[in-house]
Amino acid sequence: MIQSASTSALRAEYLRRLADKPYFAANLGTHLNLFGQHPASGWAFYLLPGSAVLELRGGSAVLCGELPGGDVGGDAREELRGFLQFLHADTLRSEHPLALDGWRPAAPLALWELPRGRTLPLPPAPPAELMLDKVPSMLPISRLVFPDSDAEADEFYSTACTALAHGVGNCRALLHGRKPVCTVGCYEASPAECYMAAGVTDPAWRGRGLARWLIVSLANELAADRTVRFACFPELCDFYAQLGFLQIGKIQHYSTDWNTQ
């Protein structure tokens, strides 16, 4: 049976199931701690049969842990499928491979890390005309990260500002005048991990090594205290391998179209 993590005991069980799992403990744990007691936030958190937990926001779902095997597992997968359909979730990230009728596997995301206490060689510094801002205004950052979607930019702005206001993570930006042209941040963290995300360069400034320098700079800074991790699509794997990050695993990625079913 799918249970909402709506009590302190169920939220504690949700966090216990995440227990130091790369990517999931930092991401799902941060979101639960920030938004788990605020249903109007748009985030929702559930305990599933077996060792699984589920996070939902809009049309996106994240599954960590495993459903039971055998007939019980078949029933649990069918319940999950119906639940996702009812809530119109059409993308799913999962810790383990998952077979759900009507869901198509996409290329897995690659999970990378810089272990705690390690540093990477710093790429060449950006041009002198750019200024590093360690506490940038998040509104223009949100528009740099999601230039084509006001809704996604607003969601990112809300989540990032909430995290930063609660002392979770950091944002870095390179400014040209007052305009951010490159950014990367950490908006999710666990006691063992800082999760980096939203690394973006303005198209007009690409090809100048800005992201290389900014990503490595922040990763080296964060790795002084915790292991740094992030996920990327397959086409960016060569980029991060060249910088010296270690690939440690994959995150399964699925999608569906309920209009065709």
Model feature map: region roles:
Residues M1-A99, P147-A151:
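N-terminal charged segments
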Residues M1-L28, P108-E155:
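Short amphipathic alpha-helix that is part of the acyltransferase structural core
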Residues G58-C64, E188-A197, R206:
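A conserved beta-turn-beta hairpin within the catalytic core of GNAT-like acetyltransferases
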Residues D71-F83, A197, T201-P203, G207-E221, ...:
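Conserved acetyl-CoA-binding loop-helix of GNAT-fold acetyltransferases
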Residues P97-A107, R212, P234-Q252:
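Conserved active-site alpha-helix within GNAT-family acetyltransferase domains
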Residues P105-G117, L246-Q261:
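Conserved catalytic-core motifs of GNAT/GCN5-like acyltransferases
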Residues S149-V200:
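A conserved beta-strand-loop-helix scaffold within acyl/acetyltransferase catalytic domains
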